[in-house]
Amino acid sequence: MPKLMLALDVLDRDRALKIVEDVKDYVDAIKVGYPLVLSTGTEIIKEIKKLCNKEVIADFKVADIPATNEKIAKITLKYADGIIVHGFVGEDSVKAVQDVAKKLNKKVIMVTEMSHPGAVQFLQPIADKLSEMAKKLKVDAIVAPSTRPERLKEIKEIAELPVITPGVGAQGGKIEDILNILDENDYVIVGRAIYQSQNPKEEAKKYKEMLNK
């Protein structure tokens, strides 16, 4: 069965920590992005990890030249267990992050195809090549969309790597459409459906139970 990853895209530190406290028994990892980190600072990652003792992934979708990617990785992986990067910038930029991560025993997760409708314009046409590149570079995992189950399946088969898949919940992705594609090494990302709900704890529990079927 795949694991559950919470996308914690809130802006307020206290609210973020309250949600983490509420859901920590039902999520396997937490993903933080620019909204929370730009609002509160990178140390929020350390606070979250201390509170829940779960893997915390920095979803910064790093997409710069190798020298800049290296600097971003060094700052981020001081606290985070892994970092998400874009692959379209090329092998050298991804390798720069991998070099930092390897020294710190941290993870690099590479985007192949995103979950929103606009991803079909430019990312989807190159997603298969990005999946091949991810396999070649032996990144730790890839990002592929739950909103397009057929693409999730194709990308996973090409890359032969663990997948973290966004889009379940608010974006319309359904767990029942992807469960047979995923295995115990994969993560399903749920964000707004949990953190915007009246009861994040109950929603997290519900999604965890759905994954355990």
From Swiss-Prot:
Q: Which UniProt keywords apply?
A: Decarboxylase, Lyase, Pyrimidine biosynthesis
| Pathway(s) served | Pyrimidine metabolism; UMP biosynthesis via de novo pathway; UMP from orotate: step 2/2
Enzyme Commission number(s) from the entry: 4.1.1.23
Q: What class of enzyme is it?
A: lyase
Task: Give the catalytic activity.
Answer: orotidine 5'-phosphate + H(+) = UMP + CO2
What is the superkingdom listed in this entry's lineage? Archaea
Annotated substrate binding lies at 9, 31, 59-68, 115, 166-176, 191-192
Which GO terms are recorded in the biological process aspect for this UniProt protein?
'de novo' pyrimidine nucleobase biosynthetic process; 'de novo' UMP biosynthetic process
Cellular-component GO terms for this entry: cytosol
The family database entries (SMART domains) matched by this protein are listed as: OMPdecase
Active site per UniProt: 61
What Gene3D superfamilies does the record tag this protein with? Aldolase class I
* Assembly and binders: Homodimer.
Q: What does this protein do?
A: Catalyzes the decarboxylation of orotidine 5'-monophosphate (OMP) to uridine 5'-monophosphate (UMP).
What HAMAP family has UniProt attached to this entry?
OMPdecase_type1_A (MF_01200_A)
**Family to which the UniProt record says this protein belongs:** Belongs to the OMP decarboxylase family. Type 1 subfamily.
Name of the protein in question = Orotidine 5'-phosphate decarboxylase
Q: Which organism is it from?
A: Methanocaldococcus jannaschii (strain ATCC 43067 / DSM 2661 / JAL-1 / JCM 10045 / NBRC 100440)
Q: Taxonomy-wise, where does this protein's organism fall, top ranks first?
A: Archaea, Methanobacteriati, Methanobacteriota, Methanomada group, Methanococci
Name of the gene: pyrF
